[in-house]
Amino acid sequence: MYAIFKSGGKQHKVIKGQTIRLEKINQSIGTQIKFKKILMCCNGTHITIGKPHIHNNFILANIINHGRHKKIKIIKFNRRKHYKKQQGHRQNFTDVLITNIHNNYREQNNGS
């Protein structure tokens, strides 16, 4: 079973037991969090697509680490004008462990 959810303006495809790196989440390490913006869920035989989200489905995850990415340098430079500007940036991130994907799919009988 896998699911696609939205967090931090990005979409992520996950399976149970996977560790993923997300934009910073302001919770402490060890906290269990619930993602409710599920865009798609597949249980092996049936695919459910949300419009835009699937209601009553959620993903449970535990926060395992906070950190910062490597520094990137932003450089603006104009030749012959004696102009050079440098800036650095480090993005914060959170590592989470997916513990459960809760899928509320129930097969409906169409009378046949």
From Swiss-Prot:
GO biological process, one term: translation
PROSITE patterns per record: RIBOSOMAL_L21
One CC-aspect GO term: ribosome
UniProt GO MF annotations: rRNA binding; structural constituent of ribosome
Keywords: Ribonucleoprotein, Ribosomal protein, RNA-binding, rRNA-binding
Subunit field text: Part of the 50S ribosomal subunit. Contacts protein L20.
Assigned protein family: Belongs to the bacterial ribosomal protein bL21 family.
Purpose of the protein: This protein binds to 23S rRNA in the presence of protein L20.
NCBIfam families from the UniProt entry: L21
Protein name per the record: Large ribosomal subunit protein bL21
Organism the protein comes from: Buchnera aphidicola subsp. Baizongia pistaciae (strain Bp)
Upper taxonomic lineage: Bacteria, Pseudomonadati, Pseudomonadota, Gammaproteobacteria, Enterobacterales
